Amino acid sequence: MLCSCDGCALLFQDGYGRYRRIPRDAYYLADFRLDELQWEALSIPINLAFFFFSTAANCTLAFYPSAGGATESLLDLAAWNGIAAAHPRIQQMRPDVEALLVNRLANPSEYYVSPIDRCYELTGIVRKHWSGFTGGDAVWKAIAEFFTTLRNEAVKVEPRHA
């Protein structure tokens, strides 16, 4: 992210050229699900993660928030491509600026197409509030508050009906 001012947002709103505008809306994916086998195939060691297509790397990358910041997890691209192929909204994510944000701490799990800066906001929350080996009560409360806010602000994408 180079700038977040309204002027740059207007200038780069069409996504042409080198810079892209980060969208403001998050979308709750009511019909998206990952079963345990799919999640395990992605090799994410915790139950929070975000996935986005990086134009610099020319592939989808996976990160999870940690006490040390955003931590990259080596992603099995075949597993990811199989998941993405079944979900049109995931295929439509804008490179570099939108991510699939997964919250498997919630019951049931929650899935959002989120502006990338919200993913890094969550990472900052984890980094700021983490204490000790297991994180401490403050971090889990802050994570829950983050997702409550995101859930309330997100546009709900209704399930597809055949």
Question: Language model features by range: what are they?
Answer:
Residues S4, R20, F51-F53, A62-Y64, ...:
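Residues in well-ordered beta-strands of folded domains
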Residues M1-Y28:
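N-terminal cysteine/histidine-rich coordination modules
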Residues P45-F52, D76-R89:
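Selected N-terminal structured segments and early membrane-anchoring regions
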Residues N81-A162:
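C-terminal, charged low-complexity interaction regions
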Residues T55, P65-G82:
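Primary mode marks residue(s) on the alpha4-beta5-alpha5 output face of response regulator receiver
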Residues C3-C5, C59, C119:
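Generic recognition of cysteine residues
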Residues A26-G68:
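Ordered, amphipathic secondary-structure segments that act as subunit-interaction surfaces
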